[in-house]
């Protein structure tokens, strides 16, 4: 679907990416994560064409190559689209630009967004739903979602994610998330990419990743095991092992615990706030 080749990008003199490479698979949900400032949102903006790389290229397959932005939806972390317009005016403008005859506003009705409201009067959650509604009207093949969804209330977040699941099921839409809170989306993610220092530190299918990272609770250090990260307490310690193998269970003096995605990512970044 998307191929990033030898990409470099700087903010002023600060280098964010240098000779960066990535393949995004069609029909998959990819999660991009890492500590704040590592370049997650920048990477989405580069894919979306909002930012331009200093060198390298971003290639799209034949279904998108002629006009990538026509087949792509980008929900950024600001959602400031059409703020000065009424909902109805923004819809009309969007329909004229994209030559849309029939506009489905059922999501707007479900979330109490009125056509006579100004965009600036909508809550953050309503703006996200409105933006998603505009995107859906163009029948996107690729959807890029920044971390804005965790700024909206539980109900609207649920509406958003249910619609996303429908899209993936019915339309085989490719989705790329940038995310700091994984509990809402963990069950729909196929692949996890963790960025560190402008490089890919981890790139795993989610089930493979969960099988490879385990927590060992023990009062003695596990011998000759690859400890990724540890947390010390008064009477015991938690050891995060990667890559974990089943045979290691015979070598540990303590319990082996399965981890959710939040705990796994925290282990990789050494417990830093993400």
Residue ranges and their predicted role:
Residues 48:
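Helix-to-loop junction immediately C-terminal to a conserved catalytic motif
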Residues 78-130:
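ABC-family P-loop ATPase nucleotide-binding domains
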Residues 2, 17-19:
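Conserved structural motif at the start of ABC-family nucleotide-binding domains
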Residues 229, 233-274:
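C-terminal coupling/interaction segments
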């Amino acid at each position: 679907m998307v191929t990033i080749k030898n990409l470099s990008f700087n903010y002023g003199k600060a280098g964010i990416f240098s000779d960066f490479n990535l393949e995004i698979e069609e029909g998959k949900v990819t999660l991009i994560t890492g500590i704040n400032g590592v370049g997650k949102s920048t990477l989405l903006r580069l894919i979306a064409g909002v930012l331009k790389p200093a060198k390298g290229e971003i290639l799209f397959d034949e279904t998108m190559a002629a006009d990538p932005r026509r087949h792509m939806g980008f929900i950024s972390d600001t959602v400031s689209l059409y703020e000065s317009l009424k909902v109805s005016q923004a819809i009309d403008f969007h329909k004229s630009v994209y030559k849309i005859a029939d506009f489905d506003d059922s999501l707007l009705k479900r979330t109490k967004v009125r056509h006579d409201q100004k965009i600036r009067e909508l809550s953050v959650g309503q703006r996200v739903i409105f933006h998603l509604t505009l995107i859906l009207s163009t029948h996107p093949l690729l959807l890029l979602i920044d971390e804005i969804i965790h700024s909206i209330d539980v109900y609207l977040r649920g509406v958003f994610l249910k619609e996303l699941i429908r899209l993936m099921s019915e339309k085989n839409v490719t989705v790329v998330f940038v995310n700091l809170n994984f509990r809402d989306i963990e069950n729909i993610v196929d692949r996890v990419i963790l960025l560190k220092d402008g490089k890919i530190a981890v790139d795993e299918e989610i089930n493979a990743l969960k099988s490879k990272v385990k927590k060992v609770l023990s009062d003695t250090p596990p011998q000759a095991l690859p400890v990724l990260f540890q947390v010390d307490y008064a009477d015991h310690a938690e050891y995060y092992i990667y890559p974990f193998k089943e045979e290691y269970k015979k070598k540990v003096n303590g319990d082996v615990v399965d981890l959710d995605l939040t705990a796994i990512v925290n282990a990789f970044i050494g417990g830093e706030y993400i």
